[in-house]
Every structure is written in structure tokens, then in C-alpha cells.
A protein has these predicted regions:
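N-terminal ligand-binding/catalytic initiation module
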Residues: 1-87
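Solvent-exposed, charged interface segments at domain starts and junctions
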Residues: 39-46, 104-108, 128-133
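Short glycine-rich or small-residue beta-strand-to-loop segments that form or flank ligand, phosphate
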Residues: 61-65, 90-94, 125-127, 149
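Gly/Ser/Thr-rich loops at beta-strand to alpha-helix junctions
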Residues: 67-71, 97-101, 129-134, 154-156
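A glycine-rich, Thr/Ser-enriched phosphate-binding loop motif common to dinucleotide/cofactor-binding enzymes
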Residues: 92-110
């Protein structure tokens, strides 16, 4: 069974970077669509989940990317809504690389502080943290038990 990745990108052109990473990560085929909006998602996802039985869907995945994180979150929600019972595939959401960057930074920090990565009860300051990477990093740190302060260089934060 070939491993397939449906790449849904909210930017007009699908990211070449994301496609290369997908192939290097082991995908046999990557089907990339650019300019994806919520209304496009259902039929694309159904194309993935209806062509393979539930036991074979482990060889299919959906990646949501693009530069606009808010648009990506909407596409992600539409992907989840398109699933039907056991007819679902693994989904990765990483618009603008915000999730992978935050996870890498937090992982590095946790292991720099403690060999076991334990940061419970520690204080963490996320500087310039009001953007997508900083907010995700702050959430991960808080979830791991740190007391988190977020700073910003903007006078107003949405």
C-alpha cells in the first residue's frame, strides 16, 4: 500500500518546502492543492477517505499548511468535519511552520533546563511571544507545568 499525503495549502501556490519535507519523510505521493479555502475541503478529504477502507487509511494523511494561520485553522476545522466515523486519516496542521518551530524550541529548552525535560514549577518568559510561534510555545510550556509570561513588542495585541 502506497503512503499518500493530501497537502492542503491556504497560500496560492503550495509550498515546495512542505512537499520536499513530505517526500523526505517517506510519502510515496503528495497531492498538493493551493489556495484552499473551507469550501474546497470536504470533497478533497472525501477523495482520501472513500478510496481506502478504514484499515488502510493508516497509509493516508492530510497536511494543512500555508502562510495564513487563521485560514489554516479554518481549513483544519473543515477537514475534521469531513470525516465520517472510522473513515478518517491522520492530520497535521503546521501553517507557517508555527507548530513545529514551537515544539522544537520548547523541547530544546526543556532539556537544557533538566535532563528529563521537567519544567514543572519553573518560570518561563516568552519574548516577542504574541505571534503564532510564541503563543504556541507559551501554551506548550504552560501545559508542561511552567509559570509562563508572554511579552510583546506590539502596543496592541489582537
Amino acid at each position: 500500500m502506497r503512503t499518500l499525503l493530501l497537502h492542503l495549502d491556504t497560500s496560492p501556490r503550495p509550498s515546495v518546502f512542505d512537499r520536499i519535507v513530505a517526500y523526505d519523510g517517506g510519502a510515496d505521493a503528495v497531492m498538493s492543492y493551493g489556495g484552499v479555502v473551507e469550501g474546497d475541503v470536504r470533497d478533497l478529504v472525501h477523495g482520501v477517505i472513500f478510496t481506502r477502507g478504514p484499515k488502510d487509511l493508516h497509509s493516508s494523511a492530510i497536511f494543512v499548511g500555508g502562510a495564513d494561520i487563521v485560514a489554516g485553522e479554518k481549513v483544519l476545522a473543515a477537514v475534521r468535519q469531513a470525516f465520517m466515523g472510522p473513515l478518517r486519516a491522520s492530520v497535521l496542521f503546521d501553517s507557517n511552520g508555527s507548530n513545529t518551530t514551537a515544539v522544537a524550541a520548547v523541547s530544546k529548552l526543556r532539556h537544557a533546563v533538566s535532563p528529563e525535560g521537567d519544567i514543572r514549577g519553573r518560570r518561563a518568559v516568552v519574548t516577542a511571544g504574541s505571534g503564532p510561534v510564541g503563543l504556541r510555545a507559551a501554551g506548550l510550556l504552560a501545559r508542561a507545568g511552567a509559570a509562563v509570561t508572554v511579552t510583546t513588542r506590539r502596543m496592541s495585541v489582537k
